[in-house]
Amino acid sequence: MAMRQTPLTCSGHTRPVVDLAFSGITPYGYFLISACKDGKPMLRQGDTGDWIGTFLGHKGAVWGATLNKDATKAATAAADFTAKVWDAVSGDELMTLAHKHIVKTVDFTQDSNYLLTGGQDKLLRIYDLNKPEAEPKEISGHTSGIKKALWCSEDKQILSADDKTVRLWDHATMTEVKSLNFNMSVSSMEYIPEGEILVITYGRSIAFHSAVSLDPIKSFEAPATINSASLHPEKEFLVAGGEDFKLYKYDYNSGEELESYKGHFGPIHCVRFSPDGELYASGSEDGTLRLWQTVVGKTYGLWKCVLPEEIASENSDSIYSSTPEVKA
């Protein structure tokens, strides 16, 4: 019998959703933040998509957003030449970090004491959040605007991507360790601490590299241009989305395409697995986020598995469906 994937649709944004990030698992569950060109990043309950609040204060498109591990702080990167740090519990703005150009990416260290930023001025900046008045440390070397910058190796190193280059930096010496060059634009980058894996997308390719050495591990080709990909926490599956509005799910070990789903009405800009691996979230040009089950038919969050005998009295269709009770 077929199992029907029924995504939860999270509305509220008015422009394309360009970035999203999950927190770690906290005593209150886990959380999801989304960055949008409407300039209003939103915080949601991660497993249901329920809206918690909107961070108000940016005066331009928000290109990047992240949460610290315990979801007490949020950070956002925007076209108004600022990065902002927020109290994710109260929604209050804690600090504004002025830049000289559009900011595209933000990332907290594990202890939440430092914030890494990158953007159109080609510089990486490291802010000490306990000394907001202090000038940030700056790392130069990129030759085009920085799209993504991430702490790695327990914050001892930094990974960053510009148009066609991924670079690995040593935090202590602020110097470049190694770089990777691509023949087309790098569209996304994800770092998996368990196993030190780096996921890079460019063109139709989804490539996996060692985050320590940048050596290649494996790569897959998708049927369409891919904008983002995410590896399951247990490294069983990966999901990817891009220009053809579809989400693809692959077996990480064999590279076999397991499923593909169309739910968005525009290109997919970002996709990430939840920290427990039970779902993945996607953000699109259509202004929505959607939450998808990793294992269709499992009762989890707002999804409840309805068996054929339970719906026989309502209709004669015997398709198994994993149906959300309400829309977020």
Task: Label the predicted regions.
Residues 102-202:
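Solenoidal tandem-repeat scaffolds enriched in leucines and small polar residues
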Residues 35-38, 76-80, 117-121, 160-164, ...:
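Conserved strand-to-loop turn within each blade of WD40 beta-propeller repeats
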Residues 6-10, 50-55, 92-96, 133-139, ...:
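A short beta-strand motif characteristic of beta-propeller blades
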Residues 41-45, 83-86, 106, 124-128, ...:
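WD40-repeat beta-propellers
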Residues 21-29, 66-71, 106-113, 150-155, ...:
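Loop/turn segments within WD40 beta-propeller blades
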Residues 10-39:
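Beta-strand-rich domains and repeat architectures in extracellular enzymes and scaffolds
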Residues 10-17, 56-62, 97-103, 139-146, ...:
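WD40/WD-repeat beta-propeller blade N-cap
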Residues 225, 259, 265-267, 275-278, ...:
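Terminal intrinsically disordered, low-complexity extensions flanking WD-repeat/beta-propeller proteins
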